[in-house]
């Protein structure tokens, strides 16, 4: 039962990724124009970094997808919404369930890709924790304005997923740079 639920949710997530591809492409194009423009203004040599650009696009796609899945994109914001929201500071009120596993899985790619995008982020493991915690706290905060649940255990699981992805990325980066 739990496996079929997780499988269904993963396919739903993949479908969201596919549907948000054009939006992510537009955002990526804007980021590239700004990035190349800054390099041009600074009179730097404009480098074509295909792998870095691919990672940037995928990271934008992941961020947009997470914002859609969590209800930030498409949510109805309102002034009275924070009063209607439920904020839980109880840890694992419902136990360690499929939603907990999915939270971790959702944030693994979010933590994995920045290792290949941002210089020197991989040097300290706590960068992965900060990356996940800040983004997750931001999501939970905004969710209070759209009448959704905000839960402390979501922040913890999202941060754990980000850290797992970050550490996998660091390991892969270390393996690939040793071989060169």
Question: What residue ranges belong to the model's regions?
Answer:
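Bulky hydrophobic segments
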Residues: 1-152, 166-180
């Amino acid at each position: 039962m739990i496996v079929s639920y997780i499988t269904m949710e993963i396919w739903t997530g993949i479908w969201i990724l596919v549907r948000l591809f054009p939006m992510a492409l537009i955002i990526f194009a804007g980021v590239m124009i700004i990035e190349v423009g800054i390099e041009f203004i600074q009179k730097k040599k404009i480098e074509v970094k295909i792998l870095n650009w691919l990672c940037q696009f995928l990271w934008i796609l992941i961020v947009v997808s997470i914002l859609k899945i969590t209800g930030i994109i498409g949510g109805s914001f309102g002034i009275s919404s924070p009063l209607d929201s439920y904020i839980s500071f109880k840890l694992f009120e419902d136990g360690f369930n499929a939603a907990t596993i999915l939270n971790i899985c959702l944030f693994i790619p979010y933590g994995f890709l920045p290792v290949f995008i941002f210089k020197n982020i991989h040097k300290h493991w706590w960068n992965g924790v900060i990356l996940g915690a800040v983004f997750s706290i931001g999501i939970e905060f905004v969710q209070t304005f759209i009448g959704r649940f905000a839960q402390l255990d979501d922040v913890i699981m999202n941060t754990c997923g980000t850290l797992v992805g970050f550490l996998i990325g660091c390991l892969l980066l270390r393996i690939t740079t040793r071989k060169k």
